[in-house]
């Protein structure tokens, strides 16, 4: 059975550079039909997304594997955001996962077992690893201050860095950059991101002075930093619950 910390069984979808999904090019008739229906449909959930940040994430079971992520968020209320995660901000970006972000208050209401799955955001913001593309720091700073006190739970559904041409296997839990050996983002990844977006992480760092993390950093979050243990999912066969026998 599939596991998030094992390479999937070899197949056409598991070999390649992961840049282009498998499948034929979209037909002109299909594209025209979709444009027409998009004009008639509300797309309300998607139109609620008003936040875009770019950062990096590490695999919980293998922090040495690090990826650039673009997070598009919908603020449900002051304490909760729900986000779609992509591998870039281009029109051909891959949807690679989802992240939920909660305030310190909501996080502290969770059970310790649940808290193990969540990560903090203060370090990546203070180190300017998390940026708001095209938004001036002065405008972004109030939101960055809020995010620095928050916690996130990010499930990666498409391991593009592995070269997968389709989403394979089960989701992987992701963790945020941290000031420990395996949690420090590789310089070449930061350099590539900066060049693509015309920014300088080093130049942004001074503007992050005064941004603080949670009032009382929860020791269960960022579980791997303290306990040196990550989390991986396994798919296991199980008996189905049913109220009547199968025909």
From Swiss-Prot:
Region spans: Disordered = 1-28
* Superkingdom: Eukaryota
The UniProt similarity line reads: Belongs to the OBAP family.
Q: What's this protein's name?
A: Oil body-associated protein 2B
| Name of the gene this protein is made from | OBAP2B
């Amino acid at each position: 059975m599939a596991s998030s910390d094992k390479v999937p069984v070899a197949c056409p979808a598991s070999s390649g550079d992961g840049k282009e999904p498998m499948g034929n090019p979209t037909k002109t008739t299909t594209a025209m039909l979709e444009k027409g229906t998009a004009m008639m449909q509300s797309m309300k959930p998607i139109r609620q997304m008003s936040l875009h940040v770019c950062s990096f994430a590490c695999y919980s079971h293998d922090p040495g594997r690090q990826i650039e992520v673009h997070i598009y968020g919908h603020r449900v209320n002051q304490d909760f955001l729900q986000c779609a995660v992509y591998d870039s901000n281009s029109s051909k970006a891959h949807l690679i996962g989802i992240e939920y972000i909660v305030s310190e208050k909501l996080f502290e209401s969770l059970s310790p077992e649940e808290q193990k799955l969540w990560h903090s955001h203060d370090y990546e913001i203070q180190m300017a690893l998390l940026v708001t593309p095209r938004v001036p720091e002065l405008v972004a700073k109030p939101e960055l201050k809020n995010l620095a006190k928050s916690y996130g739970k990010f499930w990666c559904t498409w391991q593009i860095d592995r070269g997968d041409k389709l989403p394979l296997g089960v989701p992987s839990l992701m963790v945020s950059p941290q000031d420990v050996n395996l949690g420090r983002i590789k310089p070449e990844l930061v350099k590539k991101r900066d060049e693509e977006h015309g920014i300088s992480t080093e130049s942004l760092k001074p503007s992050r002075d005064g941004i603080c993390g949670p009032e009382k950093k929860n020791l269960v979050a960022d579980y791997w930093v303290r306990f040196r243990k990550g989390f991986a999912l396994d798919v296991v066969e199980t008996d189905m619950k049913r109220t009547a026998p199968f025909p």
